[in-house]
Amino acid sequence: MIRLLSTRFKFRTLLIFLFLLAVIDPVLKQFGQVGLNFLDVLFTISLLTALYSISGNRKILLSGILLVAPIFFLGWTGFAKNEFYLGLVMYTFAMAFFGFVAVSIIIHIVAEESVTMDLIYGSACVYFLLGFMWAIGYGLIELLIPGSFSVGGHVLTRIDYLSQYGFLNDNLSYFSFVTLTTLGYGDVLPLSPPAKSASTLEAIVGQLYIALLVARLVGLHTSQSMAKKREKKGLEEICKPLLEKDQANTQKKQ
């Protein structure tokens, strides 16, 4: 566990919890309150791990703390339960936090000069963070404009996020990742104009991110390979005169 939480593998740690949150969320909600409580803990750990992943820069870390603090306060104290406006505040901060962490990791990826496994883990984390950010955004749209989504042909009248601490509605989380990957099964549909615009934007961002990420990683790998070749060539040029001198001395002795 110490190795898992080391600074070197902080993105791998975040990726593990984000993956679990995405996959286990619909399953846990089938177990009633026990499942919801476990989901609350998993969501909290995911937020803390996301905060830890950006802890390398003090200013960025402080900004992250300011964003995540209202989420914990309103969520764990229960003040946001059944309070519409406090709920909106909490989910707005949650959406902003996921977006902030995603942008922070993207900046880190762009600044890197070599391809490492942790860089690849970080790139995958951004993809999950974008999915969760949009999932919460869809929840906000549904709260503000009831009936914005249709699930299995049934138009939602109101999703009561405020009755529990769990932020992620399994249907909208599922819809978010399906949209992000442009699978488009059609079982969950956006109906209101804001919902349609948000889903269109997510599909565009999802495809652009993959394309730009691949281009960035290929560029880094190419420059890294060229740098190694130049370094090897430089060492050969430095060592060549020394080798020739040694060979000449050996021939003289013979």
Name each model feature, range by range.
Residues 166-227:
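Pore domain of cation channels
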Residues 59-69, 87-94, 117-124:
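Cytoplasmic-side transmembrane-helix entry/capping segments in multi-pass membrane proteins
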Residues 28-33, 134-174:
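Outer-pore turret/helix-boundary of cation channels
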Residues 102-148:
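Pore-domain transmembrane helices of cation channels
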Residues 23-36, 50-58, 80:
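Short, hydrophobic transmembrane alpha-helix segments
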Residues 1-15:
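N-terminal membrane topogenic signal
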Residues 235-254:
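Long, low-complexity, intrinsically disordered cytosolic termini of multi-pass membrane proteins
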Residues 30-43, 87-97:
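Structural signature of hydrophobic alpha-helical transmembrane segments
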